[in-house]
Amino acid sequence: MDLTQQAKDIQNVTVEETNKNNSESIECSKITMDLKFNNSRKYISITVPSKTQTMSPHIKSIDDIVVLGMNLSKFNKLTQFFICVAGVFVFYLIYGYLQELIFSVEGFKSYGWYLTLVQFAFYSIFGLIELQPIQDKRRRIPGKTYMIIAFLTVGTMGLSNTSLGYLNYPTQVIFKCCKLIPVMLGGVFIQGKRYNVADVSAAICMSLGLIWFTLADSTIAPNFNLTGVVLISLALCADAVIGNVQEKAMKLHNASNSEMVLYSYSIGFVYILLGLTCTSGLGPAVTFCAKNPVRTYGYAFLFSLTGYFGISFVLALIKIFGALIAVTVTTGRKAMTIVLSFIFFAKPFTFQYVWSGLLVFLGIFLNVYSKNMDKIRLPSLYDLINKSVEARKSRTLAQTV
């Protein structure tokens, strides 16, 4: 653009350049021109970066949040929330059904780590495919951070899948519902967050409900094993940490969901492959799955596909609304999964499941309420007493009349 021709009608041109000491590195010079037109009262401020300033090609889309090719940044916050919630529920409900279906295959329960290996392989492929349309394919999060995230992801999904060989599926899910407890602990130690009385009460309710549910399951479930409780508890701890680490890394480096999935799961695939090779667990698993390819690899593909779509929406929730909101949404989805599990798969049932589950969800409600006290106003105890007294007076008056 010829600046001489553009400045013919300009009355004032101000050029300011600032340089620091010669010994210091030259900072980005800024040329600011105030253009005042004769027949207009408007002022135009133009900032021209110097040649030394590098312009990253992803700056224009720094706020773009793309999930499965859909740009959520075009929608308002409420619409973004409902889209993410719908995606989480639809895909993860199918995911949960397929997960229990795979472990219902006779003889498969001891191959939970191999299922995780196949799942990570599919996730890596899906992430690579989703990354192709993006022009800027540079990795933004440091490799060391991805190694940590991959390790936590392996712990979360591997231990969770393996625990199904020892636990009833609803018991595993109810443990996952209590992920808010370690998430809160992770928020305190990793991000320095502080929680109020409602959050602490929520944690207590969930803990008591979890203990009650586990005791009920141990009395009636034929395949209950304490090893499964240990495995799923370790998975919860890893899951609590990973949510906070992902939130911190994605917001700090402005990484895309597809990048997060590709690198964390591909590195995790290497971890699991090395682990299975060293423990001689790879050969028997491959032999077993080769005998039942449709019911193993076929189910695993659909299981991984729905899980990948679901995790994409979960990562979007984390990036937009934070880890705690994302966990709350996924917890509601798990409640639906428990109901569907009892409907589609035969298993023993006791009403202690219901009461303990309600106690857990009471804790979840308290946690959500603590984050939305300005929007959700519950009546105080004093208000409830006054209302009951007024109701009694009105009844007495009505009877007198």
Swiss-Prot record:
GO terms for cellular component: endoplasmic reticulum membrane; Golgi membrane. It comes from the Eukaryota. Disulfide bonds: none annotated. One of its GO terms (molecular function) is 3'-phosphoadenosine 5'-phosphosulfate transmembrane transporter activity. It holds the Pfam family UAA. The keyword Transmembrane helix applies. Keywords: Antiport, Glycoprotein, Golgi apparatus, Membrane, Transmembrane, Transmembrane helix, Transport. The chain crosses the membrane at residues 78-98, 111-131, 147-167, 170-190, 200-220, 223-243, 267-287, 298-317, 324-346, 349-369. It is found in: Golgi apparatus membrane. Glycans are attached at residues 12, 71, 254. It is a multi-pass membrane protein. It catalyses: 3'-phosphoadenylyl sulfate(in) + adenosine 3',5'-bisphosphate(out) = 3'-phosphoadenylyl sulfate(out) + adenosine 3',5'-bisphosphate(in). Belongs to the nucleotide-sugar transporter family. SLC35B subfamily. Probably functions as a 3'-phosphoadenylyl sulfate:adenosine 3',5'-bisphosphate antiporter at the Golgi membranes. Mediates the transport from the cytosol into the lumen of the Golgi of 3'-phosphoadenylyl sulfate/adenosine 3'-phospho 5'-phosphosulfate (PAPS), a universal sulfuryl donor for sulfation events that take place in that compartment. This is Adenosine 3'-phospho 5'-phosphosulfate transporter 2. It comes from Pongo abelii (Sumatran orangutan). The lineage of its organism: Eukaryota, Metazoa, Chordata, Craniata, Vertebrata.
